[in-house]
Amino acid sequence: MKSPVLLVAYLYPPDNFSGAIRAGRFAKYLRKLGHPVTVLAAAAENAGQVAEDVHRVRGEFGFGLRRDFSGYLERAIHKYFLPSDWGYGWAWRAAAYAARFMRSSPRPVVVSTFPPLVGHWVGLWLKKRYAAGWIADFRDPFWGDPVRNARQAALFDRRMERAIFRNADRVVANTDVLQEDWRRAYPQWREKMHLIWNGYDPEEGLGPLPLPPRPYQVIAHVGSIYSKRHPAQLLASAGRLTERGLLDPKRLKIRLVGTLDRDELVCRELLDSLTASGLVEIVPELPRAASQEVMATSDYLLLLDMLLDVPSVYVPAKVYEYVQVGRPILLCTTRHSPSERVLSLSGVPYRCVFTDDSAAETDRKVLEFLSLASDPAELRAEFAATFAAMPQAIELSGLIEATARMTSYPI
């Protein structure tokens, strides 16, 4: 039998958060490989053992904090000390459950995933308390992440990241750019660093569906839109092209599906104007199955990278769903981003609009993109070898077994 695993994942399916998907894939395919996997996740209320191998304890979510001491403490920590995360109270409740689990035999290898940070808090505590084998998985950068830019958290983040790298047996990055950043920052721990990209589950059966009959084409974005991930360049270009008569608003609809933080957007006036004209359609957040149907029935797909003043180190998780549909993808990103490199490996037609493109260059690219045929393309075999769930689970399984072999629990 393969080594047992305790997967500490604050977010876990069926939670409707993109951060839950990677943990769900890991658990599913590690079990296929013979690992007994127990998941420790959060819930809005204490749910206990919701499945034979999934245990949920009450967590804190920004949209529904309790009006009790734990809720007020959560708000205070979030506001004054660590504004980039939630779930601080969950960490202690989760640790109490994990302590009981660690007394079982054989003891598991702990795999924790971030964000939010509290997953690694639990992993670090289990390492310190029980000498557990520990693999720390990062779905985003941590210290130095341009998005985690709160001044009051900078010193804590740096110290916490060093503690993770010092104590974890393995650390896993989800992009090669992040892995290289780590190697420069912590050369003394290079041998701990591994790369497992985000990916996709072929068994979900996501693929193109027939396009419904309609008098217009649809370019769809599915996911959250906020200050650092927004469609301003595309909207501005669509406005200019419409004014010049090069784009017929009756023949195109830009469909934005998901949460939209209008107050944070630099393009909110333009968004309101194009929505009023009918060129833009805003659809509230949908369940995952419904959002995938939107992807599968769209002529084109819009992928928004993190648009920052520095080169992107991110790859939006949606890219792995989009490429399974196979229809053309317009990527708004920075130059030389890992998102562009992932798309280049897929075999799916795409075009990139870069943050430093001129208005004229952006307009040229948008028109060129909209001239692409919407026939779906098949994924390249080499793409699946890197990004499909089973090859990634095999890689993680190897790390788990290596960690188990080097772990010596105290008697």
Question: What would you call each of these model-derived segments?
Answer:
Residues 130-135, 143-163, 202:
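Nucleotide-sugar donor phosphate/pyrophosphate-binding loop at the beta->alpha transition
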Residues 43, 177, 196-199:
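Carbohydrate-associated surface elements
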Residues 211-229, 235-238:
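Conserved donor-binding/catalytic core segment of Leloir-type glycosyltransferases
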Residues 229, 287-294, 301-320, 329-341:
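Nucleotide-sugar-dependent
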Residues 39-102:
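A conserved catalytic-core segment of Leloir-type glycosyltransferases
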Residues 162-192, 340:
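A short, active-site helix/loop in glycosyltransferases that binds the activated sugar's phosphate group
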Residues 251, 255-260, 264-292:
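Nucleotide-activated donor-binding/catalytic signature segment of Leloir-type glycosyltransferases, i.e.
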Residues 1-59, 170, 405-411:
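N-terminal subdomain of nucleotide-sugar transferases
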